[in-house]
Amino acid sequence: MAIERTFSMIKPDATRRNLTGAIIAKLEEAGLRVVASKRVWMSRREAEGFYTVHKDRPFFGELVEFMSSGPTVVQVLEGENAIAKNREVMGATNPANADEGTIRKTFALSIGENSVHGSDAPETAAEEIAYWFSGTEIVG
């Protein structure tokens, strides 16, 4: 098993409801370690840049609006197979399809307000981590 890093974000719907600690607890219980974390309020430009991969999708404007509507917590997680483990703990994008006990099944309000984001591959993890953190901000 490989120790790897992944990017994780707690979205505005969850921070508004003061769920940051509960979500981090679920991640830590799964064996993931937070090695960098900061609370940010994304500007529209930051949200557009971060989600540029979706710029041609019909939901892009709504996504940018939502992500810039309140604070988020961006973080770097580390652990064995961290990318897959984080995605497993988050659950399916649509909370209606998420397994019991996952973050999205427990906390998400809808498919749009689904409480968390996580990288889906090593390449996207590296890009997303670099978008929000300098190397000196990650302390393992």
UniProtKB/Swiss-Prot annotation:
Keywords assigned by UniProt, alphabetized: ATP-binding, Cytoplasm, Kinase, Magnesium, Metal-binding, Nucleotide metabolism, Nucleotide-binding, Phosphoprotein, Transferase
Enzyme type, top EC level: transferase
GO cellular component, one term: cytoplasm
Record-listed E.C. numbers: 2.7.4.6
Active site: 117
Major localisation: cytoplasm
Cofactor: Mg(2+)
Protein name: Nucleoside diphosphate kinase
Species in which this protein is naturally found: Brucella ovis (strain ATCC 25840 / 63/290 / NCTC 10512)
Gene label: ndk
